[in-house]
């Protein structure tokens, strides 16, 4: 598995991305409509998009205690056809090194997690995130 920045050539693949439970996130095709101060990241397994997330460098991060060198992780999802295979965990584990390499001006990741989203909370804890900013 690998992660990389979203490309406009991914647009068609995002149309086919299966995500029906939208209680806690937007569909990726909606999330890429506004990328001002945001970085869209896709997780790939054999060139198939299996995960998606936004790293938001805008003002919203301050709502969660972010600093100028923080990124707010939002809109994180796994395509329903690929859930329960570890792709979400792998994506989160690859993310700190990806940021170090491609966005070195940022030093921490802020999570804005709805308390009712127990699956996300568990996933973040299991991949080393805590209630404090994740230092990278």
Set out the residue ranges of the language-model regions.
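Extreme N-terminal starter segment of soluble prokaryotic enzymes
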Residues: 1-2
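Active-site acidic-Proline motif in GNAT/NAT acetyltransferases
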Residues: 79-85, 115-116
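Short, well-ordered turn and helix-capping elements at secondary-structure junctions
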Residues: 57-59, 77, 115, 133-136
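Conserved catalytic-core motifs of GNAT/GCN5-like acyltransferases
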Residues: 110-112, 125-136
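Residues forming the Rossmann-fold NAD(P)(H) cofactor-binding site
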Residues: 89
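Conserved beta-strand-loop-alpha-helix junction that forms the acyl-donor binding cleft
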Residues: 105-121
């Amino acid at each position: 598995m690998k992660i990389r920045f979203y490309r406009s050539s991914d647009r068609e693949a995002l149309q086919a991305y299966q995500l029906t439970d939208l209680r806690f996130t937007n569909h990726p095709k909606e999330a890429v409509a506004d990328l001002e101060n945001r970085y869209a990241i896709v997780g790939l397994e054999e060139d198939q998009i299996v995960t998606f997330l936004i790293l938001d460098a805008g003002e919203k991060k301050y709502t969660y205690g972010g600093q100028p060198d923080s990124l707010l992780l939002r809109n994180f999802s796994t395509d329903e056809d690929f859930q329960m295979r570890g792709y979400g965990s792998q994506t989160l584990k690859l993310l700190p090194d990806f940021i170090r390499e491609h966005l070195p001006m940022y030093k921490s990741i802020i999570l804005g997690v709805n308390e009712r989203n127990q699956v996300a909370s568990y996933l973040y804890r299991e991949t080393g995130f805590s209630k404090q900013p994740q230092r990278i």
